[in-house]
Amino acid sequence: MKALSKLKAEEGIWMTDVPQPELGHNDIMIKIRKTAICGTDVHIYNWDEWSQKTIPVPMVVGHEYVGEVVAIGQEVKGFTVGDRVSGEGHITCGHCRNCRGGRTHLCRNTTGVGVNRPGSFAEYLVIPAFNAFKIPDNISDELASIFDPFGNAVHTALSFDLVGEDVLVSGAGPIGIMAAAVCKHVGARHVVITDVNEYRLDLARKMGVTRAVNVSKENLNDVMAELGMTEGFDVGLEMSGAPPAFRTLLNAMNHGGRIAMLGIPPSDMSIDWNQVIFKGLFIKGIYGREMFETWYKMAALIQSGLDLTPIITHRFTIDQFQQGFDAMRSGQSGKVVLSWD
């Protein structure tokens, strides 16, 4: 079958032929319809320090997808051939304390689809049936293909009560923008997003944020005054991984504020811990999605009217994958979707 693979320990990604994956007793086989390019895939393409330490070569990459079930293992219940599914990209062990306690997103033995095992940039994908999620009929293939990153956004945004709260989102990448849109949809008052990339700030404006602030040109304190905010933000979502952005967020938080962190800093990061201590801030680390509460909330948010379509800015066939990666690497894109149909 055709697959996009990391074939060499250098920059790039290559289309190749690989054997069709084998189906286990508890697995389902998915014929891929659409895949989306993740920031992780860009890291793998660039062959940065993280990728060199993490990715075995060769490896079929990709973990954002939607497809159709075409085969089912003999022990599988709850799925039938023809079901339209996406799936949780974190494969968990099932026997550690967190798995057995129902906190599977905190499994210490997690492996990643398209990272540690063959991924979804292929004609067919095999995953444990436990990881599959049926897509409701009224949700499009395109939106379903970005459920993985949308789940990061939902998990981060819904970590705290948002109704009537003022929210600061640092980092206007696709996940940050989707998180901001979730906050507005569920009842936050002011949702302010910061970045230095004007293209993505414009995208955030299209998604309905209260203010999209280019911090290289505009002072956040002035924006807060403009909005009539006198005490700081109640909730902070750190989506950038940029130390200066996190420090700005800490400065802008109200006393007793709550912060969810999804962005991954490139190296050790120093902050003024006095801000955390004397403001009584609560900081929560976010990894992946809650299985499967986040997934049900994703579907419900879209069904209740949350419009994510503006976040998908580029569409290509799988044979145009290089154009897709070029768009993602340029920083002048939202989500990029590749069609296998």
Curated annotation (Swiss-Prot):
A GO molecular-function descriptor: L-threonine 3-dehydrogenase activity
Catalytic activity line of the entry: L-threonine + NAD(+) = (2S)-2-amino-3-oxobutanoate + NADH + H(+)
Annotated compartments: Cytoplasm
Gene3D superfamilies documented for this protein: Medium-chain alcohol dehydrogenases, catalytic domain, NAD(P)-binding Rossmann-like Domain
Complex formation: Homotetramer.
Entry similarity comment: Belongs to the zinc-containing alcohol dehydrogenase family.
HAMAP family on file: Thr_dehydrog
Function recorded in the entry: Catalyzes the NAD(+)-dependent oxidation of L-threonine to 2-amino-3-ketobutyrate.
UniProt name for this protein: L-threonine 3-dehydrogenase
Taxonomic lineage: Bacteria, Pseudomonadati, Pseudomonadota, Gammaproteobacteria, Enterobacterales
Gene: tdh
